[in-house]
């Protein structure tokens, strides 16, 4: 393949994730984005929890029952001249580090806001994570077909609470029953709203020019006058769109619409294609790798068990950073130092898996994994280096896992270690007893673990409270001092799923006292994979 063909393939790629608070309409947006990309013909209406049509991106058993996305799915679809990779992240209040790690694999994010509610808690948390890497953000103000708050007020809230400048690209005309469409500030065009339900995309009527008398006829004189008045305010008070500020994560272009009504999503997608960065470079422990390099590199950011109930398999999701993946390619797994032949990588249309012949930077491919691949693994064509910035967070909640049938201890341990390698939960085995303690970022994770132990490992387990309030990974360069520390504190020490030593503290006070007592020991809140 010639360098110019390779460069063309790379420049076609856009890789993004959607971040939002639960119920802001993220799963609906995912559906509609795929619909506009023609990837699915019937956008499964998402909340029909009892019906058989489940949203294309929610496919694990528990998700199907609850109608929430728990695991991250990956979908690739064509849009205009580009190939878009969409990573769906759990939006439910209780989600895991999976979400955080997924954000390390994208080049851009779409923030979805319920315009009736404004900025909500989960959105704040996710924005903090995107901040760590200055990820560019586009914003979609959703649910304009309902009664909403004053759009100007919501923009102010985004700016003050999320510390990011807003540049409106479209502006709404009315809302709820009176929602008439949006005006595009940069094209001087009004797009009139006709509801499109399910998989019908209506032909949009366009009125050119803000002063066009046809606009008054189409939306009514009152709303047309209100629009002109609001736009004067908006243009005076808000930011102009600047590509550089957007790419630096300092400014977000804002689009208005209703995902459920299939309206406005395409304007946002057009913005994504025009402005979102092509595959970005990534740092390793030795140098920075750019997408233009011909040698293949990639990193694993997520592992998912049993994507196919018919196969007891696990799939490792790898983000391609540079080079072209080709079938039966030989790659070095840097952590183990072993060369492996990858003959059956997968591409994703959530839940449907098809084998692929090639992949380029920005693409996400799935590797079959029988326990040999871990989150954070780097694959190269021989170069020894490791991509950095894929974190393990110290859990915030802890439970003891207990068996109903004590004879299944072996299966329980196997299941928990596999789930911890997958990043679904973290496991701690105390040095002084046979307890198994699991740590998570949110309560729902414990339910997920118990449910999956039952369906995937045939182990009946229950979780109960345990006297642990926080955990820190410990490290000390002086082996003698570490040994002394271990001997004196073994009641509060445990090994995690990767056999790393961790201090499990009953209280924050205890942790702080121990820290003061052993200044030569480092207590880490995150650990690189």
Swiss-Prot record:
GO CC annotations on file: cytosol
Residues covered by the tr-type G domain: 11-280
Entry keyword annotation includes Manganese: no
GO molecular function: GTP binding; GTPase activity; guanosine tetraphosphate binding; translation release factor activity, codon nonspecific; translation release factor activity, codon specific
Transmembrane portions of the chain: none
Keywords attached to this entry: Cytoplasm, GTP-binding, Nucleotide-binding, Protein biosynthesis
Xref: PROSITE patterns: G_TR_1, G_TR_2
First-listed, main subcellular location of the protein, grouped into a coarse class: cytoplasm
GO biological process entries: regulation of translational termination
CDD domains named in the record: RF3 (cd04169), RF3_II (cd03689), RF3_III (cd16259)
InterPro entries: EF-G-like_DII, EFG_III/V, G_TR_CS, P-loop_NTPase, PrfC, RF3_C, RF3_dom_3_sf, RF3_GTP-bd
Keyword Secreted: no
Localization annotation: Cytoplasm
Residues noted as binding GTP in the record, renumbered to the chain: 20-27, 88-92, 142-145
Purpose: Increases the formation of ribosomal termination complexes and stimulates activities of RF-1 and RF-2. It binds guanine nucleotides and has strong preference for UGA stop codons. It may interact directly with the ribosome. The stimulation of RF-1 and RF-2 is significantly reduced by GTP and GDP, but not by GMP.
NCBIfam families, per database record: prfC (TIGR00503), PRK00741.1 (NF001964), small_GTP (TIGR00231)
Family the UniProt entry places it in: Belongs to the TRAFAC class translation factor GTPase superfamily. Classic translation factor GTPase family. PrfC subfamily.
Name of the protein in question: Peptide chain release factor 3
Gene from which the chain derives: prfC
């Amino acid at each position: 393949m010639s360098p110019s063909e390779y460069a063309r393939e790379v420049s076609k790629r856009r890789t993004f994730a959607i971040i939002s608070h639960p119920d802001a309409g993220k799963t609906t947006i995912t559906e509609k984005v795929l619909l506009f990309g023609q990837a699915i013909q019937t956008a499964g209406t998402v909340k029909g929890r009892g019906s058989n049509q489940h949203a294309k991106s929610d496919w694990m058993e528990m998700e199907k029952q609850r109608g929430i996305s728990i695991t991250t799915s990956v979908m690739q679809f064509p849009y205009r001249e580009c190939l878009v990779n969409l990573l769906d992240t759990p939006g439910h209040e209780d989600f895991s580090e999976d979400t955080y790690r997924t954000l390390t694999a994208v080049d851009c994010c779409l923030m979805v806001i319920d315009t009736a509610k404004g900025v909500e808690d989960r959105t704040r948390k996710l924005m903090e994570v995107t901040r760590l890497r200055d990820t560019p953000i586009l914003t979609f103000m959703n649910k304009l077909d309902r009664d909403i708050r004053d759009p100007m007020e919501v923009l102010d809230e985004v700016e003050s609470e999320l510390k990011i400048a807003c540049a409106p690209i479209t502006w709404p005309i009315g809302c709820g029953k009176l929602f008439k469409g949006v005006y595009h500030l940069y094209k001087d065009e009004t797009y009139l709203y006709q509801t499109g339900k399910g998989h019908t995309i209506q032909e949009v009527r366009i009125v050119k020019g803000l002063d066009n008398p046809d606009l008054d006829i189409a939306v009514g004189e009152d709303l047309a006058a209100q629009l002109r008045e609001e736009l004067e305010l908006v243009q005076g008070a808000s930011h102009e769109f600047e590509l550089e500020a957007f790419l630096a994560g300092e400014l977000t272009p804002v689009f208005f619409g209703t995902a459920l009504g299939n309206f406005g999503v395409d304007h946002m997608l057009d913005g994504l294609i025009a402005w979102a960065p092509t595959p970005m470079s990534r740092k390793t422990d030795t140098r920075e790798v750019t997408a233009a390099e011909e040698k293949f590199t990639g990193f694993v950011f997520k592992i998912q068990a049993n994507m196919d109930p018919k196969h007891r398999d696990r799939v490792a999701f790898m983000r391609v950073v540079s080079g072209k993946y080709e079938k039966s390619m030989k790659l070095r797994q840097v952590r183990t130092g072993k060369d492996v032949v990858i003959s059956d990588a997968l591409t994703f249309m959530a839940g449907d898996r098809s084998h692929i012949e090639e992949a380029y930077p920005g693409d996400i491919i799935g590797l079959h994994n029988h326990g040999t691949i871990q989150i954070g693994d780097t694959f190269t064509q021989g170069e020894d280096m490791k991509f950095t910035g894929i974190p393990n967070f110290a859990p915030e909640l802890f439970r003891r896992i207990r068996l109903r049938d004590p004879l299944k201890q072996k299966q329980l341990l196997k299941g928990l270690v596999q789930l911890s390698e997958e990043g679904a939960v973290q496991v701690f085995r105390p040095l002084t007893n046979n307890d198994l303690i699991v740590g998570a970022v949110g309560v729902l994770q414990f339910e997920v673990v118990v449910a999956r132990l039952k369906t995937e490992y045939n182990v009946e387990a229950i979780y109960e409270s345990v006297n642990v309030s926080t955990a820190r990974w410990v490290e000390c360069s002086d082996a003698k001092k570490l040994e002394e520390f271990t001997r004196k504190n073994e009641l509060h020490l445990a090994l995690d799923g990767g056999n790393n030593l961790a201090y499990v503290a009953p209280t924050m006070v205890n942790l702080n006292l121990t820290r003061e007592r052993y200044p030569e020991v480092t207590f880490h809140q995150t650990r690189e994979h």
